């Protein structure tokens, strides 16, 4: 059995990266938007914003000034010789996991300054043997399989105490995401079952059933709704943060079951992300060839959070409010639309970065691309100011 815990010092979840073989030819688009030489090569498995800098991990830690629309990523002199597999941020700190070893801390000096501080240089307490970290507001730490039938695996590489709370789950079950009162894994949705004390105790939610197995991803709108991705559908749910026992019920005020899930129509779906693009909110579903979007119903009515089939849109249906506007669809189709997108990240714009729409900021969107020839594998960004996709 694995144990997934949430000790007070940490904050977690994770995105699963799927390796796929894909090919494409970019020559036809080079004349329209010259492609940059990538400053990060390889598979990016995490991206966070910390102290007005961006940090990515692709085996090692990379950083970039988030306040500038241009600029290259530079490698951070942090944990040389070790392979960082996942990261989260909190305040001015980046927490980096070396799978099977534990979690280390890197303190960012902030935008306009180079370097940082490794604090401490040893594995953080209660993280020995950690496999993965992830998430934001209520992240989780995933620990390895138990070493014996008598150990809980909580917070100590198989030798911790069950008083840490968390989830006891199978060795083939991985955390995909978490938020206030819930955790989503590849097999189930778990909801908080104990509203007292500081421990994080969760139980499998019997009110939620995925259409297909395994569950592939989850994302949150930051306002109480979270969305679960499986092979055919996206499910909209909400949960009481205090763990009132109602489970992850339908997030739509009307309670209509047909409003709580929709077929995403994405071939070989791999990831899901929530994007607030100006005044419009979307779910982006990455798959084996680019992504599709689901426009969310927003407002104060009974349809808030509602998922509708008519709002599932491919490139031919994108509008000016889309992440990739309709007049940039050809550039999308000539670049990332040809390849697998295995992860999607959004970064709120700061001074000098991002675009605007009537005074409302639009975020930059980063995607992880997979190419069978490896020539275009890596991190790409939609620059909301320039309105174009390009390599990072």
Curated annotation (Swiss-Prot):
Region (Disordered): 148-173
Subcellular location: Cell membrane
Compositional bias (Gly residues): 151-160
Domain of life: Bacteria
Record key words, sorted: Cell membrane, Lipoprotein, Membrane, Palmitate, Signal
CC terms in the record's Gene Ontology section: plasma membrane
Primary localization class, coarse: membrane
Lipidated residue numbers (N-palmitoyl cysteine): 20
Signal peptide limits: 1-19
Lipid positions (S-diacylglycerol cysteine): 20
Membrane topology category: Lipid-anchor
Family per record: Belongs to the TP013X lipoprotein family.
Protein name according to UniProt: Uncharacterized lipoprotein TP_0462/TP_0463
Phylogenetic classification of the source organism: Bacteria, Pseudomonadati, Spirochaetota, Spirochaetia, Spirochaetales
């Amino acid at each position: 059995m694995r144990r997934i815990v949430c000790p007070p010092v940490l904050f977690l979840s994770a995105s699963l990266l799927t390796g796929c073989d894909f090919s494409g030819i970019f020559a036809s688009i080079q004349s329209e938007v010259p492609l940059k030489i990538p400053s990060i090569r390889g598979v990016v498995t995490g991206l966070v914003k910390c102290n007005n800098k961006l940090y990515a991990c692709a085996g090692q830690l990379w950083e970039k000034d988030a306040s500038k629309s241009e600029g290259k990523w530079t490698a951070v002199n942090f944990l040389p010789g070790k392979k960082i597999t996942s990261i989260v941020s909190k305040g001015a700190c980046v927490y980096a996991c070396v799978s099977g070893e534990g979690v280390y801390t890197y303190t960012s000096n902030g935008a306009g300054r180079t370097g940082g501080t490794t604090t401490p240089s040893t594995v953080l307490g209660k993280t020995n043997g950690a496999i993965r970290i992830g998430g934001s507001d209520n992240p989780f730490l995933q620990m390895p399989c138990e070493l014996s039938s008598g150990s809980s695996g909580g917070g100590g590489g198989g030798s911790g105490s069950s008083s840490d709370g968390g989830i006891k789950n199978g060795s083939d079950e991985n955390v995909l995401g978490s938020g206030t009162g819930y955790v989503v894994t590849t097999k189930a949705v778990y909801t908080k079952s104990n509203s007292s004390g500081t421990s994080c105790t969760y139980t499998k939610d019997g009110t939620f059933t995925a259409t297909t197995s395994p569950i592939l991803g989850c994302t949150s709108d930051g306002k109480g709704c979270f969305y679960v991705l499986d092979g055919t559908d996206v499910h909209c749910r909400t949960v009481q943060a205090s763990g009132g026992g109602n489970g992850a019920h339908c997030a739509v005020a009307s309670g209509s079951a047909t409003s709580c899930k929709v077929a995403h129509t994405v071939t070989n779906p791999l990831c899901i992300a929530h994007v607030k693009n100006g005044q419009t909110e979307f779910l982006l579903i990455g798959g084996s060839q680019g992504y599709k979007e689901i426009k969310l119903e927003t407002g104060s009515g009974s349809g808030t959070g509602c998922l509708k089939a008519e709002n599932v849109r491919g490139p031919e249906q994108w509008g000016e409010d889309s992440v990739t506007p309709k007049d940039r669809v050809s550039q999308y189709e000539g670049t990332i639309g040809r390849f697998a997108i295995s992860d999607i990240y959004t970064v709120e714009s700061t001074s000098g970065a991002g675009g605007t729409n009537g005074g409302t900021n639009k975020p930059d969107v980063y995607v992880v691309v997979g190419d069978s020839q490896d020539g275009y594998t890596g991190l790409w960004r939609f620059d909301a100011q320039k309105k174009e996709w390009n390599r990072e």
